[in-house]
Amino acid sequence: MINLTPLCKPLMHAIYAREQRLRGDVEGSQRATLRRLLRQGARTAWGRARGIDGSESYAAFAARVPAAGYEAFRPEVERMLRGERDVLWPGRCDRYAQSSGTSGGKSKYIPLTPQSLQGCHYAGAAYAFASYLHHHPDSRVFGGCNFILGGSYANEIAGLRPGVKVGDLSASLIDRINPLVNIFRIPSKQVALMEDWRQKLPRLVEASLRADVRSISGVPSWFLTVLREVPVSYTHLTLP
């Protein structure tokens, strides 16, 4: 594979520089984020019920809206799962991350809007690579593939409207990833989103052996299982 790291460096440098500017004014960047969220919240049923108009200061917002745990939001999330619009975020949400349900005995469903995926999860991954290249400028990390290990969609909830998917956070991240990232990513989306781990594991190992893997991303315990399987399934590992 052609080493695309030099082509990616200008973008990575820009991302790193932006994050450093934000670190120089942490309070200001947090206030700006709050303002953006309040402007969106003013367009929702949750915000209107609390008199949010998008212009509140932090002190006014904190006084009006006390801190709350997930259970306080469960009724609103269930409305969103049924397809209701403008509940906790403007528009409809069709992706949800499902917790294991170990706390309180009930699964939690976390709405994943396009804005949250882009502004939080994907932005965080981009900054991780940008920071790595800043500290390791001679790296050829984009000269091969990023092995991204993801989960799957469970969709265990009955009566979901068409198009709604519920499952592991990583499944939504892979499903909605920028197509350009697929240049550097293994395995294929079809393999990455497989539900049956017994069928998925050998496919993951095979994909890793056929690629020049330069970085890995995923839940450590899951990845440990994959890495342990490599020498079991193959007598030697030869990367192209």
In which residue ranges do the predicted regions lie?
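Active-site phosphate/ATP/adenylate-binding loop shared across adenylate-forming ligases
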Residues: 1-29, 34-51, 55-237
